[in-house]
Amino acid sequence: MNLILVDSKLQYAIQKLNDANFFTVDCCEGHFENQIPNTYISFVKNRKFVDAPKGFKIENGNVLRYIYKNTKSKTEFKKEQEEVINNLNKWVDYLTGDN
């Protein structure tokens, strides 16, 4: 078993995805202070997702990515990030049948 570092805001989604055999290899919640204005999850293999969480794009069949729009201040970023993570978690619950 390979272990990956998981940002705290993504722990719920990553655990649920891996438990449901949607295996992940990399992820980032996005960090204002490091000028990383996106949240993403990379999967081991291409997934045939019918849809993505609200605001996310599917890249190359194996990456879900959200690029932040409100990055002018840390407060705006954190507010948008909270909404993004909530949308992601709702999508994960739907995908894994826990809705």
Short names for language-model regions:
Residues 65-99:
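Ampiphathic alpha-helical segments that act as solvent-exposed interaction surfaces
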Residues 7-54:
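Amphipathic, interaction-prone secondary-structure segments
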Residues 22-34, 61-65, 93-99:
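Short glycine-rich, low-complexity/disordered patches
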Residues 1-6:
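Terminal, regulation- and interaction-focused segments at domain boundaries
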Residues 53-61:
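Short glycine-aromatic motifs
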Residues 34-46, 62-79:
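Short cationic amphipathic helices and targeting signals
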